[in-house]
Amino acid sequence: MKDRDIDDILKRAAGEAPGVDPALLDRVSTSIGSGLLPVRPLPPSWILSGGLVAISGLLARAGAMLLKPYGVQKMSALEIGAVFSLLCVLVWIASVLCVAEVIPGRRRLMPPWLLSACGCAALAAVFGLLFHDYRMERFVSHGVACLTAGLALALPASIATWLLLRRGFAVNAAAAGLAKGTLAGLAGVAMLELHCPIFEAPHVLVWHIAVLPICGVAGALFARTRGRPAT
């Protein structure tokens, strides 16, 4: 092959591409345009976060009133201030994270898994400082009852959270599910602190705190499974 042949090949390759049928372009444009519908913008982030905080607080209180608020009636002022101040902070952080996870590009305070881990550690520290009764009377039977009640309260909390944030888009479905599950778990823990009169340290350290990681993992697994494309 000579240099002239190579030049001819390159010139033909660089030549103008054949035109596309205008009718085909019109059909493509029409098909795309027919599927584009206007959407309402999300409310401001602070409104969404405030709504999540309100949902968690109202459901926790409603659950405690339904089961009777024996726990908070038995607490001292110091115990009430320490436990519920911590829960309020954790619920607020979880609410902000939930909103950030459904708004692409939104800055996050921390990864959801870190919130879940830090929340468990902080609750364990506060419970360990406040409650010094280390008896384990009916540890399993009482514990399973509290765990079940906390998880049962977390279910409507997670549904309400999903409904409020349903118009958002989660780039990382598992992380968003973990954040929502953690928030729902915190609502369950708050309800238990209002309701449960058992202040034995092993009971609250194991069964009350267990609601938080269980709900977080369940939320992440559910979101990941739901977001996985069908094969």
Please describe what each predicted stretch is.
Residues 116-142, 160-167, 191-196:
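C-terminal halves and exits of single transmembrane alpha-helices
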Residues 94-106, 161-169, 223-224:
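C-terminal ends of transmembrane helices
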Residues 11-48, 222:
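Positively biased amphipathic helices and basic secretion/translocation or surface-docking motifs
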Residues 163-231:
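Terminal transmembrane helical module of multi-pass membrane proteins
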Residues 106-120, 143-144, 172-182:
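Cytoplasmic-side transmembrane-helix entry/capping segments in multi-pass membrane proteins
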